Amino acid sequence: MRNFSFVEPTFQARQTQLAICQSIYDANAFNIQNWKYGFKTNPDMLPETVIAFLDLLTELKVDYCIVGGIAYLAYIQDRNTKDLDILISVKELNKIVEFVEVTNKDVNFTNADFNGLKIDFLKTSNAIFKYVKQHETTTYEFAEGVYPIATIKGLILMRFDAIIDLHQKGNFTKVVYYERDLQVLTLNYEIDWEHIWKISEGFFTNGQIKEFKKMVADWQKPRRNRFA
């Protein structure tokens, strides 16, 4: 049964230690869709499954980096996330692929299931993923232990890449979520945008960078009380 203390989202820089188990448990256990259509896995088992997977990565000496929602939550006390996103090379992925059930894959991603835990592997065959893995990683002390995660700059670059892809697919609802994540990071952290724009030149077109600059400039404008 759930034995985590409730952590209220503040949508600000994180002040409390993040527990991966709690975030993934809460996102699955309290997902209204699961209550409506049925749970595909017992959420009470997810915490120990998360620990087992992280221990497996350590045991096999896998070189990886946590990205996506869990990495974002390490910086911002926000909504929970129901899966685990892992940045990894194909060589390192081959060390653990026999321990998971692959559900889908393409050149950039491999989606898998580990005893009910959903895992998305983001492969460094993608140029921007490779850059983040090599240059924009750090460590974070989760409740479960110290693990590698993407830096804020790394998360921003990956969100930029995802936003472009989502626009091309017409998935504008998810675009809104990703843009909001970037806005919250911008409002809570001092970010070296000039460095990000410089790095972006190697991955995005001038037109794409121009649009991202407009977005960031809008987020940086002083806020006023519209209802005063």
Predicted segments, located by residue:
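Compositionally biased terminal segments of proteins
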Residues: 2-228
